[in-house]
């Protein structure tokens, strides 16, 4: 099987907690090929200043990818450039995905805090 035929599945578990928590993530599930470009959206209505993206790979601990505080990126744990966050305002944080690799198959989660 050639590399061109290999697809990378990015799965997002969304809505795992009740909607009244004030943090939502869309789309609920995302499957994409290695050449596609897609985005995940995180939205919070809690008035929090900080927002986060996490990655949970199979049989690995939860990994912090990006931290934004007051719309400014304060942490990036050497995340590959094929993942690019965007924080247009204090209640939205996007994770743009492109040219994914097989090792990118994971559960991606967002969160917010004071």
UniProtKB/Swiss-Prot annotation:
Disulfide bonds: 42-110
Span of the signal peptide: 1-21
Domain of life per record: Eukaryota
Keywords: Adaptive immunity, Cell membrane, Disulfide bond, Glycoprotein, Immunity, Immunoglobulin domain, Membrane, Receptor, Signal, T cell receptor
InterPro entries: Ig-like_dom, Ig-like_dom_sf, Ig-like_fold, Ig_V-set, TCR_beta_variable
Classification via Pfam families: V-set
Residues modified by glycosylation: 76, 89
Localization of this protein: Cell membrane
Gene3D superfamilies named in the record: Immunoglobulins
UniProt GO BP: adaptive immune response; cell surface receptor signaling pathway
Residue ranges of every copy of the Ig-like domain listed in the record: 22-114
CC per GO annotation: plasma membrane; T cell receptor complex
Free-text function comment from the UniProt entry: V region of the variable domain of T cell receptor (TR) beta chain that participates in the antigen recognition. Alpha-beta T cell receptors are antigen specific receptors which are essential to the immune response and are present on the cell surface of T lymphocytes. Recognize peptide-major histocompatibility (MH) (pMH) complexes that are displayed by antigen presenting cells (APC), a prerequisite for efficient T cell adaptive immunity against pathogens.
Self-association state and partner proteins as the record states: Alpha-beta TR is a heterodimer composed of an alpha and beta chain; disulfide-linked. The alpha-beta TR is associated with the transmembrane signaling CD3 coreceptor proteins to form the TR-CD3 (TcR or TCR). The assembly of alpha-beta TR heterodimers with CD3 occurs in the endoplasmic reticulum where a single alpha-beta TR heterodimer associates with one CD3D-CD3E heterodimer, one CD3G-CD3E heterodimer and one CD247 homodimer forming a stable octameric structure. CD3D-CD3E and CD3G-CD3E heterodimers preferentially associate with TR alpha and TR beta chains, respectively.
Name of this protein: T cell receptor beta variable 4-2
């Amino acid at each position: 099987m050639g590399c061109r035929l290999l697809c990378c599945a990015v799965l997002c578990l969304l809505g795992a907690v009740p909607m009244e928590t004030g943090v939502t993530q869309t789309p609920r599930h995302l499957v994409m090929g290695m050449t596609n470009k897609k985005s995940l959206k995180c939205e919070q209505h809690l008035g929090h200043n900080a927002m986060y993206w996490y990655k949970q790979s199979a049989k690995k601990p939860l990994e912090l990818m990006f931290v934004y505080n007051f719309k400014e990126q304060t942490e990036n744990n050497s995340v590959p450039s094929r993942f690019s966050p965007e924080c247009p305002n204090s209640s939205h944080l996007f994770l743009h995905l492109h040219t994914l690799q097989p090792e990118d198959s994971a559960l991606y989660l967002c969160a917010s805090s004071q």
